[in-house]
């Protein structure tokens, strides 16, 4: 472990001890907000304290085993214990390094999933539908809930656009690297010559932020349109203009909601999503400025970036952000078995974040 990382660990250990003292003070206990915030910070630092204590014990075990080597009768046993202690220390060093990677406070929250057909006409819409089903199936495996907020079906299947809210613990942490352009290579069902066509769809993963209630939007900046819903709710929704489309004029961000029976409920949902989008756009701008010099763009969330290719003739899926990340398991991945991809992307992101910490 580099001296820089070791210093960071020591500083966090000191902060944890300080928090322990603060949480025992009567005035802190009496202040519910401060007590909650400090308790949350303490809980985040506790795994580091536990790992450091384990490391101290492993170092003591190593020293004791090395002392045993002076006795010829115990040398073989000592060598075994030395090897075990060294392996444990290496394991703990890696664990501590990963614990240093700053946690994204949005990781445990819900998200908005937006899938839009790109270039490729009908085939792009069909592919957008494939992607949406892939994420919906993955969400089902995790026990998450998927609520469609608005959709625009393609003429021959799939979606020109579909927006859904994904509700479940850790949803954003799992799917946050999916934003970007996804490309498909396959022979369309309507292709009589057997030629491979290339089309694309874009995916946006937007965290549902707790802070949206604090965002103030000038009503003069909004253009609100109502229209007849084509979504859930049966015949009733088609009889009244209950669906809402809100345009944030300064940024051009447009959101729709048509899933509720009442215009008021649709407006509330649309405003919540608009605020989440504006907050996410500002965070992306800040992240892009900070990440300008970074090698790896796994966590950039840039929706214009081509991140992945799905090649049907070869049954291959390639993620272009990570060298060598190609899997020949396309049917299972489209069926919702995304973990082999998502875990590798998460690991690469952690490695990159550690490199930034070491350089800092």
Swiss-Prot record:
Post-translational changes noted in the entry: Methylated by PrmC. Methylation increases the termination efficiency of RF1.
Transmembrane segments annotated in the record for this chain: none
One GO location term (cellular component): cytoplasm
Alphabetical list of InterPro entries matching this protein: PCRF, Pep_chain_release_fac_I, Pep_chain_release_fac_I_sf, Prokaryotic/Mito_RF, RF-1
Compartments (UniProt record): Cytoplasm
Region listing for Disordered, in residue ranges: 281-310
PROSITE patterns: RF_PROK_I (PS00745)
Gene Ontology molecular function terms on file: translation release factor activity, codon specific
SUPFAM superfamilies, per the entry: Release factor (SSF75620)
Residue list for modification N5-methylglutamine: 235
Superkingdom in the source lineage: Bacteria
Entry keyword set: Cytoplasm, Methylation, Protein biosynthesis
Cross-referenced Pfam families: PCRF, RF-1
Cytoplasm is among the record's keywords: yes
Protein purpose: Peptide chain release factor 1 directs the termination of translation in response to the peptide chain termination codons UAG and UAA.
PANTHER family assigned to the protein according to its UniProt record, in alphabetical order: LD18447P
NCBIfam families documented for this protein: prfA, PRK00591.1
Family: Belongs to the prokaryotic/mitochondrial release factor family.
Protein name as annotated: Peptide chain release factor 1
Lineage: Bacteria, Pseudomonadati, Pseudomonadota, Gammaproteobacteria, Lysobacterales
Recorded name of the encoding gene: prfA
